[in-house]
Structure formats: structure tokens, C-alpha cells
Amino acid sequence: MQDSIEQYMQKVGQQARDASRVLTSASTSLKNHALSAIYTALENNQAAILAANQIDMEKGRSNQLDSALLDRLELTPARFKGMLQGLKDVIVLVDPIGEITDLAYRPTGIQIGKMRVPLGVVGMIYESRPNVTLEAASLAIKSGNAIILRGGSEALESNKAIAEAVKHGLKVAGLPEHSVQVIETSDRGAVGHLITMAEYVDVIVPRGGKSLIERVTNEARIPVIKHLDGNCHVFVEAQADLQKALPITLNAKTHRYGVCNAMETLLVDEKIAEVFLPHIAELYAEKQVELRGCPETRRILGSSVKPATEEDWYTEYLGPILAVKVVSGIDEAIDHINKYGSHHTDAIVTENYTLARQFLARVDSSSVVVNASTRFADGFEYGLGAEIGISTDKIHARGPVGLEGLTSQKWIVLGDGQIRQ
């Protein structure tokens, strides 16, 4: 069986590499034609795709998937509509491929510049979310990359149904149907092959639980664009407008629990804790959010708040649990975030411009937010059209990874017969 998986993955890799050579030189109009055809195919097959998703949901419930995974897995009509809107947004994005920048003459008379080009073949490994299949495929096509998609077994039927619509659109436009391939086996050996096929795959993008990301990071022989988890914070500073702070901290935690940009720790300045905490605690109680607090938080709110442990400060709950800590000021808040956070998304609520700038400069995260919810850390909200993932690394791409994150630059040299003396 291992040999057959290896052969299957080698075939997928070769097909992706061949397709990438065609996509590299595909015009913007041709790529947009393919994306428009995919949009039409998805619209025409919405009922079948949602039915396939229900099969996955039923299997998920039977297999007792936790609520966070089930939430990510589910495709409602509203989420399907959001997927289509994301695809529309990608179509109208400016195509970065072929863009030439920094063109300048050298004393020798040659011109030196940089041209933006596709990465080549992207390998994507993800869990649960079938909408990622379309987001990743659309961004790959628009940026001239082939992509190999390895979704979780729990979303296999949904992913296959979406992939059929994508293939149809590619065929209509005359682009290789293997530009986008979904791995149609649940054999875990497929992941091991995908992350080590350096001859076929140029970059790996894993999206999922911490154990998946750690495995890919440790075993991959290919560059990885990743974030381990989303332990996000909101710091309500002493000069915060509480009419802003209350809805921001409620939204950051309760808008959706099972996402990487949800707040997991609330930090409150000691100068306003006595006033702010009872109000926000009442709102969290209505949403049945369990609070785990520091001693000062428990003194203010009472013993109904569970004592927070050291582990709580590190934890991405992905559920209705929130750690709460009262801090002495901005320095302690920033130190806490940089020590316990995951460098994903962290926010401050304050009316003090100087402190807001200080927070922006000193918090070591891929997205830093002032007076808004952490839930905005998303490619769609950032105007990227969609995102293939979020990176907390500092090399190549950081934060939500959209079209430009799936490209690199090569040097171009333009001469008129010059030789080096």
C-alpha cells in the first residue's frame, strides 16, 4: 500500500509541476476567465456541494468531532455565499505577476530591476474547513501557481465536490485541469510524501491544529508558511473608551470561537478593572463564556471565576473559555503578550495616541490592532480577496497570505551588448 501511495503522490506532483509551467505564462484575462467559469460552476452545483457537506457533517457527528471542528466543517448557505464573494474579490484583484519594480540604470548602461513571478507549486495541508479549498485554489490560479490540496478526511466529500467545480472552470478556460488537485485518499502517508517532494513542490502551507503544524514543520524538506496557533489578546488600557471596549472585547471572543483570530486572553489595566470587568463579565455570562482569572480578577468578580494557571496564559481555547488578567499598565501588558502570545494578532483599546503607537511598535505579532476586534485579522477583511493562510514567521510572508505572498521576485538585467570589463 505504501508503494501505491508513493506512486500516486509522485504522479500528482508531476502533474502539478507540468501545470505550473503553463500557468506561469497564462495571461490575466485567461486566469480571470477560469475563475469566472469556476464561479458559475459553483453556483450551478450549490445544492450538490451542500449535500456533500452534510454527508461530512453526519460522519463528523458520528465520529464525535468536537464543536470547534464541526463549526469549521459546516458549509451553510450563508458561508457558501461568502465563498462566492471571496472568489469574486479575487477576480477583480490586480494580478501581481509580471510586475517590474526598482528598474534603474547602472553606470555600465545595463538596467537592473525585479520581476514578480509565481512560486511554482504550492502544497496545502488543512483540516475541516472546505471553504479553504476554494480560497486556496482561486489564489493559486490568480497568482499563476499550481496547487495540491490535502484536506482533512472529515471534509473529503465537501472538498471533492468543490474540486469538481474548479476542474470544470479550468477546462472551460483551456487551462490544465491538474492546476488544482485534491488528494482523494485519507491515507496519512500522503502528507509525508507531499511535504518531502522537493522536486515537485516549492512551498507547503499547513492550516490546522498545533500537532499538524508541528509535524509539518519538523518533517518538511520544503519551505513552510505557517502559524502554530492563535493565542490572541486584547488589552483594555486605562484611557480606553469603554463604549468601544465592551463591544470590541465581546466580539473578539464570541463572534466565532473556533477560529485562530479569536481573543483567548483579556488584559485589563488595573486603573479601570473595577469598573470595566463587571460589565464585560455580565455580557460574557449571557454567552456562557467560562472565565479563568488572575487573583485580582477573582477579587473583583468573585469565586465564580476559576483561577487561571500558568498554562491558561499559553492556551488557544477555540471555545467559550477566556483567560483574564489585570495588569499594572502597558509595559506589563506588552511583556505578557510577547511572552505568552503566539505572534498572531493582538489589540489595544485606548484613546491615548502615544500609547497606541508604542503598542504597535513593541508587540511582536503579525497583526497589531488599535481600537478594533482581533477578528479583522483575515485576508478578506484586509482586502486581499481571500487568504491561503496566516504566517507568524518573519521571512517571506507575514500575517494573512494573499496573492503577493504566493509570489517571489527575480532579478532582471536588460542590456544592449554590454560585457563585463
UniProtKB/Swiss-Prot annotation:
One of its GO terms (molecular function) is NADP binding. Its EC number is 1.2.1.41. Keywords: Amino-acid biosynthesis, Cytoplasm, NADP, Oxidoreductase, Proline biosynthesis. InterPro entries: Ald_DH/histidinol_DH, Ald_DH_C, Ald_DH_N, Aldehyde_DH_dom, G-glutamylP_reductase_CS, Glu-5-SA_DH, GPR_dom. Pfam families: Aldedh. It is found in: Cytoplasm. Its main location: cytoplasm. GO terms for biological process: L-proline biosynthetic process. Pathway: Amino-acid biosynthesis; L-proline biosynthesis; L-glutamate 5-semialdehyde from L-glutamate: step 2/2. It comes from the Bacteria. Gene3D superfamilies: Aldehyde Dehydrogenase, Chain A, domain 1, Aldehyde Dehydrogenase, Chain A, domain 2. The keyword Cytoplasm applies. Coiled coil: none annotated. It catalyses: L-glutamate 5-semialdehyde + phosphate + NADP(+) = L-glutamyl 5-phosphate + NADPH + H(+). One of its GO terms (cellular component) is cytoplasm. It is an enzyme of class 1 (oxidoreductase). NCBIfam families: PRK00197.1 (NF001221), proA (TIGR00407). Catalyzes the NADPH-dependent reduction of L-glutamate 5-phosphate into L-glutamate 5-semialdehyde and phosphate. The product spontaneously undergoes cyclization to form 1-pyrroline-5-carboxylate. HAMAP family: ProA (MF_00412). Belongs to the gamma-glutamyl phosphate reductase family. This is Gamma-glutamyl phosphate reductase. The lineage of its organism: Bacteria, Pseudomonadati, Pseudomonadota, Gammaproteobacteria, Moraxellales. The gene is proA.
